[in-house]
A protein has these predicted regions:
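Active-site rim elements
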Residues: 17-19, 181
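Short coil/turn segments at secondary-structure boundaries
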Residues: 9-11, 43-45, 147, 207-208
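Long, basic N-terminal domains or extensions that often function
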Residues: 32
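Single conserved hydrophobic/aromatic residue that forms the stacking wall/gate
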Residues: 1-9, 13-14
């Protein structure tokens, strides 16, 4: 009992600050739908840090990173085999081939979105629904060629940029890089979630 209470308490402590109103509302919808027995699947991003952890020092507010994962993520079930590729940038080429319309994308940056499932049980209900949280990483952890040349910072640069997508909830957007990061977060969430929905549909019904 004490171990379970410690687990629940630590997890609640990690998640109880830094969440936005819309995220809280979506969580309530998931909880209510599951309690009523409705089949629902939710999608979001597996953020490493919340907005901030606040302390008052000598009467002044001090902001510190709020690490949501520092005590682990025991409730999440990672599914690396179901990871999807999300492509950023590049060019799309279109052409006709034998009367069929075809496309190809070149010059893009590839980011891998890995799903982590959180299962939600309903109050006074036998229903269990799933919330899928996406984490972002590069297909390769670092550039071996750059590392071999002694360019160690550049060897890790691309992976760091990819991981930044799922690093912080609500990054500051009062500058151009912050706006770009928020757009990348939104694009990763939409692209990976739609791919997951379509893949699951095709697996069960074999056609759109």
């Amino acid at each position: 009992y004490e171990m379970l209470r410690s687990l629940v308490g630590s997890e609640m402590c990690i998640r109880d600050s830094g969440n936005g109103g819309l995220g809280r509302l979506a969580s309530c919808y998931m909880d209510a739908a599951t309690g009523l027995g409705y089949p629902v699947t939710g999608f979001s991003i597996r953020y490493e840090f919340g907005i901030f952890r606040q302390k008052i020092v000598d009467g002044w507010q001090m902001e510190f990173p709020d690490n949501w994962l520092e005590m682990g993520d025991v409730w999440l079930h990672p599914r690396k085999d179901d990871a999807v590729e999300v492509r950023f940038g590049g060019q799309v080429h279109e052409w006709m081939d034998g009367g069929k319309f075809k496309t190809a994308q070149t010059g893009y940056q590839s980011v891998i979105a890995v799903p982590h499932d959180l299962y939600i049980s309903g109050y006074n209900s036998t229903a269990v629904n799933k919330l899928t949280l996406w984490s972002a990483s590069m297909p390769q952890s670092f550039d071996m060629n750059a590392f071999s040349r002694g360019d160690y910072v550049r060897a890790l640069e691309q992976n760091t940029m990819a991981e930044a997508i799922s690093k912080v909830l609500y990054p500051a957007d009062n500058h151009i890089n912050g706006k770009r990061l928020r757009l990348r977060q939104q694009y990763l969430l939409v692209s990976s979630s739609l791919q997951s929905i379509l893949n699951e549909h095709l697996k069960n019904y074999h056609t759109l």
